[in-house]
């Protein structure tokens, strides 16, 4: 009792220290004093006295330290806080905070019979000073804000003012902070919004903040935030349009995953609305989404998001009353019109919405009207299937499959059968569009989910079997996916729909995406892991006998569908089978047969009558499968040393016997490959004879059994033996002084046998071409690799000899081998540069030396010779140049060529164009330009000046090349046309590279001006040759241009970005008088017309047309002259441009 009285008396100006101490004790968790308990125990009289004292104290504090002075003190900074005014302000704020805390606690103990006028006055005062508080007083602001929220929630007098204050403060804070707590608190007092008058000017700031909430992720993601946003639609009917406009403007930046939340906001707003608000939401928002869902282009980033919103409403129609009727009413004026629109994309968009929303009906309609409406919609489905636009037909297929799957029981059987026959009987064989055929097989699995469809589909689907052989990969993929679905749902036996023979033929030849699916389809048929292992072997033999190549592909992907242990078991099961076949062939079973061997014989008795070692194809197939299976689990076996050792030992024990029995080359190759998986010590007799076998091969032999032998030596770490062999065969600079002494290596190679340089080149090329073997080769001693490089370099002297000596024979390599050796020399030098790049440009400099050799020896020789002499040696010098350019292109592509190397290469390319007749190098040169254009961004060490100089040279090389091609057109039109068509791909890639990496740079503008000059010159030349003005009709299509221009412009219009840049440059050329005169300007008009007729129409066409039109007007005086070609061109071009600009 005494404590309560003491507390009440402490609320005064004289005892303010004690009052503050009481409040402080309440804040300390360790102290037993509780302000809430104390207030709850106060009598009515004590409460009223306390509240009056609080009001008096608050008034006194504010009179002594007015709030407007606080802002001044705050502005003067922290130093001013130490002054008398600053300390007084601090004390005042502390007292007001304590008063606010007591008032906040008092709200919960207010009784209606009590007089709380004094408390109300305190709340009004605190509410009034809230906005005037300095920014630094967040603690007091928060406390007063909590008081306003609590006062609003209790519904006490003046709650509108406190509610508005709390609403604004929470709204502002929720947008500034990233926590969701303020959003939740704002939702609790969202009714306070209706205290604001929408039409008053003071509500402007509120509107802006509320609209900002619609693009705030915290509000969109949080449940309370979405509830709050949906309630804002009910504030004022005029605010709805502002909300919808804000959301539409932000759609492009919102993630697609958030669209379901946006749709939920609209849906909740619609569900709660009534009267004019409901009408506005439906007409201004939902129907607006419907309109844009139909009319927005598919490529628009907003289109898919609009559809997400509409999908949400479509899915709600079955669970929420009124949605179905609303969709029917809102779609009615726009959807059916969209389905009949002339624009095919609009029809396609409308079809998508129609299919998703089907059936679109008003549940309030009478049965007869409802049936009529549904019948009309089925007719729309039929019309979609017959639409001339493939995308609409594809959407129709989707609709038929979704609708029949969902409403199978309710649909009339005749309609059902007719629709499915249309899909499977006609559209599955739509020759005009692979997308339509693909849609059939992508959508049919939807119907399979309905078990009632299985009997009918079992009759219809076998007619589609040949779709497995469709010329479109995506159709084949979709067809196999459908077969997988049939198998999964057990709708039918998949081999009755598509016979196994067809499946195996596709498995043999098809691409990886199709093959992997086919393996998944037939996996359990040929590797039934749940059955005994002898069955695995039987199925394996069956598959090999049915289709050898398909068996290889099947087991190549088998490891993806079962455990590695099963693959290892299958390897040994096949080994048991081969062992049993050999035993039957020799008819001498071992006397002391082990228990395991007994099991082996038992396992394969089923195959006794069908399998024999004399069946070479089957034996080879089984051996190949062992190799394929071993390769597929090689990495897994590395982690299971015990299993790997067991497998090696088992095969090591039987391989000698296999080599004796299986003597056919088809069997030898997989046997050699098997040995390459094992260490040399496991097969010592064979490993010792490999190098002798390689040495004894004849040059020019067709078979490639040497490949597996080389693989063996590389896997055994014996690449040094190969190097010794080829070193003895390759010519050297001191060939005459070569000693006949045998090699000091473990394998002795004698010189009594003839040298075989061409075979040496075959071996080296194989090692360099295959990554694993190349790695082994490059890990050989550096000295041996350098010696090999030197030996290959002797090919240069042979090539010089072939060119310079009429009918002469090379000293080392033959005429056929010399270019090959030269190519290997170049390739090896680059591989060595990559391997030892940390040591500088040791090997790259060798390639640079090769470039100097090409320049000084080959190009200078060509320049000095007569045409007749060069014809005899054309093949040789073309091979040299092609080899050099190919290797240099690869050097730049992998980033080994620095700025200096690239610059030398470009200069050398100019030399080749000036010296060599013919254009065999053009494709390679364009590839080089493309790579340099891209690599100039990667070389970070180059200065800006070096890069600019390099790109300038790129542009010069390109210009020179195009000039050479243009000259060839004039001299030999047919040859020039063939050349240009052959280089379309690299030319397009080069232009695209320049466009994507160097837009609005000198090289970009230079390349485009070169591309402009060619067509302008050719078209101008053609126009000048015309004698009859009737032949001067403007072109309507690309095919109307002359051949050179047709090729170049055809490449330009493939890319919309290139078209825009090309038009910008054309405009600049016209404006700067680079293109001048009536004839050249007419040529520019022809180019503009062709681009405008293409698929990448650009707004820039009008800009260029206007510029050309202005230039043409400067030649207006020609209309005063007599009839001439130029006058006709002027009038025709002016008329054409006028029509274009006014269209």
From Swiss-Prot:
Record Pfam families: Condensin2nSMC (PF12422)
Residues in HEAT repeats: 460-498
Positions bearing Phosphothreonine: 805, 1119
SUPFAM superfamilies: ARM repeat
Keyword Phosphoprotein: yes
One GO BP: positive regulation of chromosome segregation
Superkingdom to which the source organism belongs: Eukaryota
GO molecular function, one term: histone H4K20me1 reader activity
Compartments, as annotated in UniProt: Nucleus
Listed InterPro entries: ARM-like, ARM-type_fold, Condensin2_G2
Positions of modified residues (Phosphoserine): 30
Keywords, sorted A to Z: Cell cycle, Cell division, Disease variant, DNA condensation, Mitosis, Nucleus, Phosphoprotein
Gene3D superfamilies hit by this protein: Leucine-rich Repeat Variant
Gene Ontology cellular component list: condensed nuclear chromosome; condensin complex; membrane; nuclear speck; nucleoplasm; nucleus
Consequence of changing residue 693 to M: In 3KS; leads to defects in mitotic chromosome compaction and organization; increases the number of micronuclei; increases cell death
Subunit structure: Component of the condensin-2 complex, which contains the SMC2 and SMC4 heterodimer, and 3 non SMC subunits that probably regulate the complex: NCAPH2, NCAPD3 and NCAPG2.
Function: Regulatory subunit of the condensin-2 complex, a complex which establishes mitotic chromosome architecture and is involved in physical rigidity of the chromatid axis.
Clinical condition linked: Khan-Khan-Katsanis syndrome: An autosomal recessive neurodevelopmental disorder characterized by multiple congenital anomalies affecting the ocular, renal, skeletal, and sometimes cardiac systems, defects in urogenital and limb morphogenesis, poor overall growth, microcephaly, and global developmental delay.
Name of the protein described by the UniProt record: Condensin-2 complex subunit G2
Originating species: Homo sapiens (Human)
């Amino acid at each position: 009792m005494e404590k309560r009285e003491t507390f009440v008396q402490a609320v005064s100006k004289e005892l303010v220290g004690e009052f503050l101490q009481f409040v402080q004790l309440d804040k300390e968790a360790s102290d037993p004093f509780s302000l809430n308990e104390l207030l709850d125990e106060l009598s009515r009289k004590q409460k009223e006295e306390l509240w009056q004292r609080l009001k008096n104290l608050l008034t006194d504090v504010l009179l002594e330290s007015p709030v407007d002075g606080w802002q001044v003190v705050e502005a003067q900074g922290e130093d001013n806080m130490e002054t008398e005014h600053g300390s007084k302000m601090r004390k005042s704020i502390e007292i007001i905070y304590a008063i606010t805390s007591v008032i906040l606690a008092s709200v919960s103990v207010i009784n209606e019979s009590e007089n709380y006028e004094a408390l109300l006055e305190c709340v009004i005062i605190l509410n009034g000073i809230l906005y005037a508080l300095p920014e630094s007083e967040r603690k007091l602001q928060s406390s007063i804000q909590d008081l306003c929220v609590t006062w609003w929630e209790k519904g006490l007098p003046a709650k509108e003012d406190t509610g508005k204050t709390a609403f604004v403060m929470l709204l502002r804070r929720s947008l500034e902070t990233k926590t969701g707590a303020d959003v939740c608190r704002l939702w609790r007092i969202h009714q306070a919004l209706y205290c604001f008058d929408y039409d008053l000017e003071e509500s402007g700031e509120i509107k802006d903040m509320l609209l900002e909430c619609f693009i705030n992720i915290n509000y969109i993601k949080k449940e309370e935030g979405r509830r709050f946003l949906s309630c804002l639609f009910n504030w004022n009917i005029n605010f709805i349009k502002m909300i919808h406009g804000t959301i539409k403007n932000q759609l492009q930046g919102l993630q697609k995953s958030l669209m379901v939340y946006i749709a939920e906001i609209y849906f909740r707003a619609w569900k709660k609305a009534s009267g004019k608000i409901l009408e506005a939401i439906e007409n201004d928002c939902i129907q607006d989404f419907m309109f844009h869902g139909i009319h927005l282009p598919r490529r628009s980033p907003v289109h898919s998001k609009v559809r997400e919103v509409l999908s949400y409403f479509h899915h709600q129609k079955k669970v929420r009353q009124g949605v179905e009727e609303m969709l029917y009413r809102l779609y009615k004026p726009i959807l059916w019109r969209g389905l009949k629109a002339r624009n095919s994309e609009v029809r396609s968009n409308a079809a998508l919405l129609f299919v998703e929303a089907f059936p679109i009906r008003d549940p309030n309609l009478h049965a007869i009207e409802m049936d009529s409406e549904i019948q009309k919609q089925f007719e729309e489905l039929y019309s979609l299937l017959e639409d001339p636009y493939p995308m609409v037909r594809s959407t129709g297929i989707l609709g038929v499959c979704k609708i029949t799957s969902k409403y199978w029981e309710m649909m009339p059987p005749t309609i059902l059968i007719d629709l499915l026959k249309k899909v499977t009987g006609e559209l599955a064989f739509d020759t005009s569009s692979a997308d339509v055929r693909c849609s059939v097989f992508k959508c049919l699995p939807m119907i399979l989910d309905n078990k009632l469809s299985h009997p009918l589909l079992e009759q219809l689907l076998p007619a589609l079997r040949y779709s497995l052989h469709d010329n479109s990969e995506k159709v084949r993929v979709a067809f196999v996916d459908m077969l997988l679905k049939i198998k999964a749902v057990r709708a039918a036996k998949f081999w009755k729909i598509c016979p196994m023979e067809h499946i195996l033929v596709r498995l043999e030849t098809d691409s990886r995406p199709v093959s992997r699916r086919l393996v998944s389809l037939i996996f359990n048929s040929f590797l039934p892991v749940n059955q005994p292992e002898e069955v695995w072997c039987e199925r394996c033999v069956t598959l090999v006998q049915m289709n050898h190549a398909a068996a290889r592909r099947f087991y190549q992907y088998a490891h993806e569908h079962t455990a590695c242990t099963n693959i290892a078991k299958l390897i040994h099961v096949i080994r048991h089978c081969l062992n049993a076949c050999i035993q039957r062939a020799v008819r001498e079973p071992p006397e002391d047969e082990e228990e395991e061997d007994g099991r082996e014989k038992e396992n394969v008795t089923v195959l006794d009558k069908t399998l024999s070692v004399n069946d070479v194809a089957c034996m080879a197939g089984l051996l190949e499968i062992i190799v394929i299976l071993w390769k597929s689990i090689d990495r897994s076996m590395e982690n299971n040393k015990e299993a790997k050792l067991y497998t090696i030992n088992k095969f090591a024990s039987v391989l000698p016997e296999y080599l004796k029995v299986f003597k056919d080359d088809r069997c030898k190759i997989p046997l050699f490959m098997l040995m390459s998986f094992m260490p040399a010590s496991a097969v010592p007799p064979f490993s010792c004879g490999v190098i002798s076998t390689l040495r004894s091969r004849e040059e020019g032999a067709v078979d490639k059994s040497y490949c597996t032998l080389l693989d063996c030596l590389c896997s055994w770490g014996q690449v040094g033996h190969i190097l010794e062999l080829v070193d003895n065969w390759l010519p050297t600079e001191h060939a005459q002084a070569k000693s006949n002494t045998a090699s000091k290596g473990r394998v002795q190679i004698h010189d009594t046998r003839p040298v075989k340089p061409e075979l040496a080149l075959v071996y080296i090329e194989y090692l360099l071409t295959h990554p694993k073997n190349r790695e082994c080769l490059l890990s050989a001693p550096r000295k041996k690799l350098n010696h090999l490089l030197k030996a290959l370099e002797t090919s240069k002297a042979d090539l010089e000899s072939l060119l310079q000596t009429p009918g002469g024979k090379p000293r080392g390599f033959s005429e056929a081998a010399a270019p090959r050796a030269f190519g290997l020399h170049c390739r090896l030098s680059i591989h060595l540069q990559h391997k030892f790049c940390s040591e500088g440009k040791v090997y790259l400099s060798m390639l640079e030396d090769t470039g100097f050799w090409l320049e000084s020896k080959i190009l200078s020789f060509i320049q000095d010779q007569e045409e007749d002499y060069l014809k005899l040696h054309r093949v040789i010098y073309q091979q040299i140049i092609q080899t050099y350019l190919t290797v240099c292109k690869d050097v730049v592509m992998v980033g080994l060529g620095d700025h200096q190397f690239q610059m030398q290469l470009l200069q050398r390319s100019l030399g080749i164009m000036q010296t060599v007749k013919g254009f065999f190098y053009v494709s390679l040169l364009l590839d080089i330009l493309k790579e340099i254009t891209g690599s100039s961004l990667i070389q970070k060490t180059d200065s800006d000046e070096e890069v600019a100089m390099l790109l300038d040279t790129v542009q010069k090389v390109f210009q020179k090349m195009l000039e050479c091609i243009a000259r060839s057109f004039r001299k030999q039109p047919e040859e020039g046309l063939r050349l240009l068509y052959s280089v379309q791909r690299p030319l397009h890639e080069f232009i695209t590279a320049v466009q994507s990496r160097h837009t609005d740079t000198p090289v970009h503008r230079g390349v485009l001006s070169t591309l402009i000059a060619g067509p302008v010159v050719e078209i101008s030349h053609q126009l000048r040759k015309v004698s009859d003005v009737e032949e001067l009709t403007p072109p309507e299509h690309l095919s109307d241009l002359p051949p050179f221009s047709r090729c170049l412009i055809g490449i330009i219009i493939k890319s919309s970005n290139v078209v825009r840049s090309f038009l910008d440059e054309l405009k600049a050329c016209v404006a700067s008088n680079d293109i001048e005169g009536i004839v050249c300007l007419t040529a520019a008009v022809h180019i503009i017309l062709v681009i405008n007729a293409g698929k990448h129409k650009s707004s820039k066409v009008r800009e260029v047309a206007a510029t050309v039109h202005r230039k043409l007007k400067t030649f207006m005086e020609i209309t005063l002259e007599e009839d001439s070609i130029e006058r006709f061109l002027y009038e025709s071009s002016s008329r054409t441009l006028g029509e274009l600009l006014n269209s």
